Amino acid sequence: MRPYKLPQKALIAEIFNSDDRFRSTTKEVEAVEQERAVIVGMDNDEGYDTLEELNELAKTAGALVVGKVRVRRRTIDNATYVGSGKANELSLMGSELEADLFIFDDELSAIQLRTLEETLGARVIDRTTLILDIFAARATSREGKLQVELAQMRYRLPRLIGQGQVLSRLGGGIGTRGPGEKKLEIDRRRIRRRVFELETELSEIEKQRGLRRESRKANRIPLVALVGYTNAGKSTMLNALTDSNVLAEDKLFATLDPVVRKITLSGGTEALLSDTVGFINKLPHDLVEAFKSTLEEVSNSDLILQVVDISCPYHEKQMRVVDGVLESLHAADIPRIIVFNKADAIPSCDLPAESENRLNVSALCGTGIEKLLSAVELKLNSARTEVDILVPYSKYEAVSMIRDRGMLLSEEHTETGTHIRALLDAESIGQLRKILDF
C-alpha cells in the first residue's frame, strides 16, 4: 500500500493522534514557561493579609506560587529588606523549591534589588513591578499602553544605578513584559528620552479627552463614575445598570481601559456611567501619575458610585484604600453612594444597614439594581432646582436651552407663550435669566 493512500479510518485516527500530541506538547511548553515564585512580605498588625493579595497578583501574572514567607521585623533592612540572615534562609528555600523568581510585597530600592539577586541567585521583583506587569498584559487601547509604559519607565529610571546585572536579566519573565520592555543595553539617557516621547504623545491624547469633556459639559450630561477596589464587581455593576456587555471577569484588574456607557433613568434623566481601573493597596505612585488623565474622569464626575465587595473579609480596609486614592485625586468631596455589591454571597442578617447613601446590591443577580438607579437619579436631580416659568414665543431659544441642558417636567403651549416646568442646575438658571432678562 502506498503511504499516501491510507485508509480513511486510519487517516482520521492519525489526525486525532497528532492533535493529542500537539495539545500535550503545548501543555508541556506552558508548564515550562510558568515561573515558580516565592512571595515574601513583612508581617503586619493591620488585620489585613497583604501577602495573600500578593499571592493573587502573582497568579494573575501567570506565576506558580511555590512558597510564602512572612517576615517579622521592626524595621526594613536597607540592603536586603529582610536582613542578611533571612536572605540566606530564602536562598536555601529557593534552591529546595527550584524557584525562578522572588516577589517582595513592598517597593525595593536599587541596592536592595541588586543585593537580593546576588544573594538569592534568582530574579527578584517587587509588588510595584508585578502590578505594572499585569497592567502591561491587560492594556488594550493605545492610551492605556502608553500610560503603562510611562509608569514602567519612571519606575525603572531611579533603579538603574548599580543595576547592570539586574538589567541584563530583563529578557523575559514576569515583571519584564509589556511595552516598557526595551533592549538589554537600555540606559538612563534612552529612558529619559522615551519618557519625554511618551509624555508628549499622552499630552496630545489628553487634549482630545479634554475636548470631549468640554463637549459633555456643554450638553449638561452628568457623569457618574464607578470606583472601587479591584475585583469588587464594577464591570458587572456597569452591565447591570446599563444592560450592556462589558467584559467582567473574576480577576484582579480585569478592566484597565475606561469604559463609558450612556443611560436614561426612569424619570428621563440622562447620564454617562464610567467604569475606571480598580484600586489596590500600595497602588504604585508612578501608575497613578501615568493614569492621571484617565483618573481625572473621576475628579470631574458629578456622582461617584463606590462599589464594595461586601463578601470580602477585608472590605473595610479596602474602603479606606479607595478613600485614600479619591483624596489624592481631589475627589473626596464629590457626592457619593456606597454600593455594597455581592450581597447575595453573605447572609442577609450580616448585611449593613441601608440608607440614602448606602445600598446593598447584587449586580450578578440583579437584586437592588432598580433601587440603586432611583438613588442615582435622586442624587443627580438634588443638584438641580425646579423652575416654573412662562417663556414668550419671541424667546423660544430659552425653551431649546432648557430641553438641552435640563430635565423637562412639563410643557404646555398657551396664548402668550410656553409654560414650562423643568429641573435646571445653577449655571443653566443663570443662562436662562440672561435670555429672559429677569
What are the residue ranges of the model-derived segments?
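Conserved beta-strand segments of the P-loop GTPase G domain that flank and frequently precede/overlap
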Residues: I39-D43, K68-V71, I103-D105, Q306-D309, ...
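Short alpha-helix plus adjacent loop in nuclease-associated cores
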Residues: T129-L150
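Conserved C-terminal guanine-recognition region of P-loop GTPase G domains, centered on the G4
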Residues: T26, L51-K59, S91-E96, E107-A122, ...
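Conserved nucleotide-binding/hydrolysis micro-motifs of P-loop NTPases
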Residues: D43-E46, R73-T75, E107-A110, T129-L132, ...
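C-terminal-of-GTPase-core extension/linker across diverse P-loop GTPases
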Residues: M1-V38, N55, P158-A232, L238-N239, ...
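N-terminal accessory targeting/assembly segments
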Residues: M1-I131
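Switch II of P-loop NTPase G domains
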Residues: F16-V29, Y48-E52, T75-L92, D257-P258, ...
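Switch I (effector-binding) loop of TRAFAC-class P-loop GTPase G-domains
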Residues: D20-F22, R209, R216-P222, A240-A271, ...
